[in-house]
Protein backbone atom coordinates (compact mmCIF):
# COMPACT_ATOMS: atom_id res chain seq x y z
CA UNK A 1 0.00 0.00 0.00
CA UNK A 2 1.83 3.06 -1.29
CA UNK A 3 0.28 6.12 0.29
CA UNK A 4 1.71 9.60 0.22
CA UNK A 5 3.10 10.40 3.65
CA UNK A 6 2.56 13.81 5.23
CA UNK A 7 5.18 15.30 7.55
CA UNK A 8 3.88 16.76 10.82
CA UNK A 9 5.52 18.21 13.92
CA UNK A 10 4.61 17.22 17.45
CA UNK A 11 5.67 18.86 20.71
CA UNK A 12 5.92 16.50 23.69
CA UNK A 13 7.22 16.71 27.25
CA UNK A 14 10.60 14.97 27.69
CA UNK A 15 9.25 12.25 29.98
CA UNK A 16 6.47 11.32 27.54
CA UNK A 17 8.91 11.14 24.63
CA UNK A 18 11.33 9.03 26.71
CA UNK A 19 8.56 6.57 27.56
CA UNK A 20 7.43 6.47 23.93
CA UNK A 21 11.00 5.86 22.71
CA UNK A 22 11.31 3.01 25.21
CA UNK A 23 8.16 1.39 23.81
CA UNK A 24 9.39 1.94 20.24
CA UNK A 25 12.58 0.06 21.08
CA UNK A 26 10.81 -2.79 22.91
CA UNK A 27 8.28 -3.28 20.12
CA UNK A 28 10.97 -3.22 17.44
CA UNK A 29 9.68 -0.31 15.38
CA UNK A 30 12.11 0.93 12.76
CA UNK A 31 11.40 4.58 13.62
CA UNK A 32 9.36 6.93 15.77
CA UNK A 33 7.20 7.58 12.73
CA UNK A 34 6.16 3.91 12.63
CA UNK A 35 5.26 4.05 16.31
CA UNK A 36 3.33 7.29 15.90
CA UNK A 37 1.39 5.89 12.93
CA UNK A 38 0.53 2.79 14.97
CA UNK A 39 -0.50 4.93 17.97
CA UNK A 40 -2.72 7.10 15.76
CA UNK A 41 -4.35 4.01 14.23
CA UNK A 42 -5.06 2.69 17.74
CA UNK A 43 -6.44 6.08 18.80
CA UNK A 44 -8.75 6.17 15.77
CA UNK A 45 -9.96 2.60 16.42
CA UNK A 46 -10.60 3.46 20.09
CA UNK A 47 -12.49 6.63 19.11
CA UNK A 48 -14.63 4.73 16.60
CA UNK A 49 -15.29 1.98 19.17
CA UNK A 50 -16.35 4.61 21.74
CA UNK A 51 -18.87 5.96 19.25
CA UNK A 52 -20.60 2.58 18.99
CA UNK A 53 -22.74 3.20 22.05
CA UNK A 54 -26.30 2.85 20.81
CA UNK A 55 -29.00 1.91 23.31
CA UNK A 56 -28.80 1.26 27.02
CA UNK A 57 -25.23 0.92 28.33
CA UNK A 58 -23.50 0.24 31.62
CA UNK A 59 -20.22 2.13 31.74
CA UNK A 60 -17.14 2.65 33.84
CA UNK A 61 -15.14 5.84 33.40
CA UNK A 62 -11.57 5.61 34.67
CA UNK A 63 -9.92 9.00 35.27
CA UNK A 64 -6.45 9.97 36.38
CA UNK A 65 -6.06 13.65 37.10
CA UNK A 66 -3.98 16.28 38.84
CA UNK A 67 -6.04 17.28 41.86
CA UNK A 68 -4.04 20.52 42.20
CA UNK A 69 -5.24 21.79 38.80
CA UNK A 70 -7.21 24.92 39.62
CA UNK A 71 -10.97 24.34 39.38
CA UNK A 72 -10.69 20.77 38.11
CA UNK A 73 -12.19 19.01 41.13
CA UNK A 74 -15.15 21.42 41.09
CA UNK A 75 -15.64 20.90 37.34
CA UNK A 76 -15.58 17.11 37.73
CA UNK A 77 -18.09 17.37 40.58
CA UNK A 78 -20.35 19.64 38.49
CA UNK A 79 -20.35 17.12 35.63
CA UNK A 80 -21.21 14.30 38.04
CA UNK A 81 -24.07 16.35 39.50
CA UNK A 82 -25.34 17.15 36.00
CA UNK A 83 -25.63 13.40 35.28
CA UNK A 84 -26.55 12.32 38.82
CA UNK A 85 -29.46 10.19 37.60
CA UNK A 86 -27.08 8.02 35.59
CA UNK A 87 -24.21 7.72 38.06
CA UNK A 88 -24.56 4.66 40.28
CA UNK A 89 -21.29 4.86 42.19
CA UNK A 90 -17.84 6.42 42.25
CA UNK A 91 -14.57 5.52 43.90
CA UNK A 92 -11.82 8.05 44.60
CA UNK A 93 -8.21 6.97 45.24
CA UNK A 94 -5.21 9.18 46.06
CA UNK A 95 -2.40 7.73 43.93
CA UNK A 96 0.34 10.06 45.12
CA UNK A 97 0.87 13.66 46.20
CA UNK A 98 -0.36 15.06 42.86
CA UNK A 99 -2.57 12.45 41.21
CA UNK A 100 -5.97 10.96 41.89
CA UNK A 101 -7.78 8.03 40.31
CA UNK A 102 -11.54 8.13 40.00
CA UNK A 103 -13.79 5.29 38.87
CA UNK A 104 -17.32 6.31 37.95
CA UNK A 105 -19.94 3.64 37.31
CA UNK A 106 -22.97 4.78 35.34
CA UNK A 107 -25.93 3.46 33.40
CA UNK A 108 -28.05 5.10 30.76
CA UNK A 109 -28.40 5.86 27.08
CA UNK A 110 -25.05 5.11 25.42
CA UNK A 111 -24.71 8.55 23.86
CA UNK A 112 -25.11 10.18 27.27
CA UNK A 113 -22.61 7.79 28.88
CA UNK A 114 -20.11 8.77 26.19
CA UNK A 115 -20.98 12.45 26.66
CA UNK A 116 -20.05 12.28 30.36
CA UNK A 117 -16.65 10.75 29.51
CA UNK A 118 -15.98 13.30 26.77
CA UNK A 119 -16.80 16.25 29.04
CA UNK A 120 -14.36 14.94 31.63
CA UNK A 121 -11.75 14.21 28.96
CA UNK A 122 -11.84 17.83 27.80
CA UNK A 123 -10.93 19.29 31.21
CA UNK A 124 -7.46 20.71 31.77
CA UNK A 125 -5.53 18.61 34.29
CA UNK A 126 -7.18 15.31 33.31
CA UNK A 127 -4.30 13.05 32.29
CA UNK A 128 -6.13 9.87 31.31
CA UNK A 129 -9.72 8.88 30.60
CA UNK A 130 -10.93 5.46 29.60
CA UNK A 131 -14.54 4.54 29.01
CA UNK A 132 -15.56 0.90 29.05
CA UNK A 133 -19.16 0.01 28.24
CA UNK A 134 -21.30 -3.08 28.03
CA UNK A 135 -24.92 -3.65 27.19
CA UNK A 136 -27.03 -4.67 30.20
CA UNK A 137 -28.92 -6.98 27.83
CA UNK A 138 -25.89 -9.02 26.79
CA UNK A 139 -26.76 -12.69 26.59
CA UNK A 140 -23.97 -14.91 27.88
UniProtKB/Swiss-Prot annotation:
Cofactor: Ni(2+)
UniProt keyword terms in alphabetical order: DNA-binding, Metal-binding, Nickel, Transcription, Transcription regulation
Lineage: Archaea, Methanobacteriati, Methanobacteriota, Stenosarchaea group, Methanomicrobia
GO terms assigned for molecular function: DNA binding; DNA-binding transcription factor activity; nickel cation binding
GO biological process: response to nickel cation
Keyword field contains Transmembrane: no
Entries under Pfam families matching the protein: NikR_C, RHH_1
Cofactor binding mode and count: Binds 1 nickel ion per subunit.
Positions bound to Ni(2+): 81, 92, 94, 100
Family statement: Belongs to the transcriptional regulatory CopG/NikR family.
Annotated organism of origin: Methanocella arvoryzae (strain DSM 22066 / NBRC 105507 / MRE50)
Protein name: Putative nickel-responsive regulator
Amino acid sequence: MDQELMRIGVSLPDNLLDRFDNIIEKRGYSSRSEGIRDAIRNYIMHYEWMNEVEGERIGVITLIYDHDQRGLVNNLTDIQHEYMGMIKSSVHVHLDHDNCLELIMLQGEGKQVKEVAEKMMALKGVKHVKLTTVSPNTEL
